[in-house]
Amino acid sequence: MDKKYSLQHSIFLACSFVLLIWFIKLFEAAFGVSFSHMGVYPQTASGFFGILTAPLIHGSFNHTLANTLPVLLLGSMLFYGYPRSRWWVLSAIWILSGLGVWLFARSSYHIGASGLTHGLFFYLFIAGIIRRDPRSSALLMIAFFMYGTMFWTIFPQAPDISFEYHLFGALSGAGCAIRCSHWDPLPVEKKYSWEIETAENELDEEDPVIGDQWKTAVNEHPEFETAAGQYKKVF
């Protein structure tokens, strides 16, 4: 689970999902069928199973195209930046966003990967704030620069757009960030040779008054020394 993916491998995984949703859309167009009934329909038994399939189904080519780049970029960033938590996060956003729609959304079929993309965005954004290491901060800034408008699309827009999927995707991503972002180890800080040499030189420098005698000095009054190596005050 904690296997680290290269950037190329991360992009490949995100591309695989994009190809899958395009294959489904092209299949619908080629055979004159629609899989919209496989979306989430709130508070119905058949619509409950749409939690698993709805992110794969899109209403039109424009709908599919609108989700292509966000899935590719945000998915690649998740796979690359969070090697331990990525699959848990992806699964949780997928299931929880659909469950929220099934419980609370309007009575209609809700389809599309936009709930997933909102979840990924909010995960990357909040995880970057929590962790504050260089990699997470960079992913946060890229995600915000590209898709900061997702803060507004969680509110009602056009009647044919499922803002509920956006909202519950965002809540799922935020919850995952709070719960899972610490699962991934902090990246190892690189030390350049000149930094190491500077640190060693500072340690080797002699005190201008006592020279390097402090390195070998013996404490002549151990009774005044505490466990932390500091001296007690005597009044």
How would you label these PLM feature ranges?
Residues 1-3, 154-235:
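C-terminal transmembrane module of polytopic alpha-helical membrane proteins
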Residues 7-88, 98, 103-110:
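N-terminal TM1-TM2 helical hairpin plus the immediately adjacent luminal interfacial "cap"
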Residues 17-20, 92-93, 97, 101, ...:
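Alpha-helical transmembrane segments in multi-pass membrane proteins
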Residues 21, 52, 63, 115, ...:
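Divalent metal-coordination and catalytic microenvironments
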Residues 57-60, 102-111, 129-133, 153-161:
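Membrane-interface helix caps and helix-loop-helix hairpins in membrane proteins
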Residues 65-82, 119-130, 171-183:
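Membrane-interfacial alpha-helical segments at the cytosolic side of multi-pass membrane proteins
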Residues 90-96, 137-147:
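Central hydrophobic cores of alpha-helical transmembrane segments
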Residues 107-123, 163-165:
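Membrane-interface micro-motifs in multi-pass membrane enzymes
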